[in-house]
Amino acid sequence: MKVLFAVNNEKTSEAIIKKYQSMYKEIISWKNVYFFNAIIKELQKDKSYDRIVIGEDLEPYTNNNYEVIDNFLFDKLDAISDEASNSTEGAIPIILIATDRRDKGDSILVKLFGIGIYNVLLGKDRSMENVCKLINQPRTKKEAKIYYKIESDEVEYQSINPDIVPEDEM
């Protein structure tokens, strides 16, 4: 198992690795990066990661307007999800440790679901043990829909392949 961590403290990554290895008796190779753009660069260089763990608070925000922050976060995660694919499994699951202001049903969760990010941890679920569980077994699309409390008609799916034009746009 190879994991790319993007959390603002290497001690957090080390603690998660230690917990995972004791829970699942499996060795993890890992790397830590500290910026959203560094995640993209690392994935362009190395497609062999099995999981990506990102802390929403990875970078400090210069703005305190939540809408601006959410748009910034979504744009970064959208770009990361575009790069997050490997040759063995396809899409690399992204595990996002959300900030404490997030709740199930938040509008950003619908947008993240639409780009294939099914592993956001919210509220009291933001624990090392739950990060380890998602590293070991990421959520399915159906599980994410239930966890995020999303209705199907809320989701606008985004094409993974920018070269494919939807039929209704032809």
Task: Briefly describe each language-model feature range.
Residues 1-165:
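Long, basic/Gly/Ser/Thr-rich N-terminal segments
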Residues 167-170:
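Walker A/P-loop phosphate-binding motif and the immediately C-terminal alpha-helix
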